[in-house]
Regions:
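Charge-rich, well-structured scaffold segments of protease-associated domains
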Residues: 1-83, 89, 99, 109, ...
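Phosphate/diphosphate-binding glycine-rich loops and adjacent basic-rich segments that engage nucleotide
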Residues: 94-105, 109-113, 121
Length: 274
């Protein structure tokens, strides 16, 4: 609760996935934490941490035989188990706009919507779209229009979070209270442009190069590469080579990005803390 920027994301996810297992804060409350015992935690682990949902991922300068030996030492004695439950796919929710008085120094705002799951073919065009809007680079469209050109917001970002059966996109910004409405107008203008005008060939090529460069740099971090490889194998049963990723990104067309922008951002929900 000391960080409104974190708290608003938790609350937005609760609302966008309302009525489902995803629609509640997993941190719990004082009363729910007080009810937990060592036995209840053990039962939870046994029910959810099944071997059919596990992957052992290792990246580094270590022989495969050594990795296998370590894995067998710590996991070899465990019996194979299978998950016996499945999550119900969250139902769609009506778009909402809610303002909550938090007496914060700044206004914090999220504009978002439900999006594609992790298996969807359009997840890559959407990833490119989100990177265009509010990726980590200083030339992202929202950073340029909100911060560099107009000096309205110091912190803005866009994220795409895919799950096994659904997903979510969110655009976040913080600003002085009197600038919040102007920020929302500028964001809406950028979204309308991306929904109605395809990117030029030159602009799209630059965006793809930047996206691929970001991926290549991230792979230099062994921990991040290890986690990404493990997740890919667990979800897709394969790990794409860097060349395969390059091929898939290069195949994305400007029209696909525009269509995704229209499909995802035609109806959005908004949560404001102020």
């Amino acid at each position: 609760k000391d960080s409104p920027a974190d708290m608003i994301f938790d609350r937005f996810e609760d609302m966008i996935f309302a009525g489902s297992e995803l629609g509640h804060n997993i941190l719990g409350t004082k009363s729910t934490l007080a009810r937990h015992t060592s036995q209840s935690i053990k039962r939870f682990i046994e029910r959810t941490h099944t071997t059919d949902q596990m992957v052992f991922s290792s990246i580094g300068n270590m022989p495969t035989s050594r990795v296998q030996s370590v894995a067998e030492r710590y996991f070899g004695q465990h019996e194979a188990t299978t998950r016996t439950f499945s999550r119900t796919k969250p139902e769609a929710v009506e778009p909402f706009t809610q303002t909550v008085s938090k007496h914060t120094h700044q206004t914090h705002c999220i504009i978002g919507a439900r999006a594609y799951d992790i298996h969807a073919e359009r997840r890559l065009p959407l990833s490119l779209l989100i990177n265009i809007l509010g990726g980590p680079s200083a030339n992202s469209r929202l950073n340029v229009v909100l911060r560099e050109k107009n000096g309205l917001s110091y912190n803005t970002e866009a994220v795409y979070t895919p799950y096994n059966d659904c997903g979510m996109v969110a655009i976040y910004f913080s600003s002085d209270h009197h600038n919040a409405d102007h920020c929302r107008e500028l964001i809406d203008r950028e979204l309308r442009t991306l929904r109605s005008e395809p990117l030029s060939a030159r602009r799209l090529a630059m965006i793809k190069r930047q996206f691929l460069a970001q991926m290549a740099i991230s792979m230099e971090n062994n921990e991040g590469y290890m986690l990404g490889a493990g997740k890919s194998y667990l979800v897709h049963d394969e790990i794409d080579t860097l060349e395969e990723v390059y091929r898939k990104v290069s195949a994305v067309k400007a029209e696909q990005i525009m269509e995704v922008a229209e499909e995802i951002f035609s109806k959005t929900s908004t949560l404001i803390y102020q």
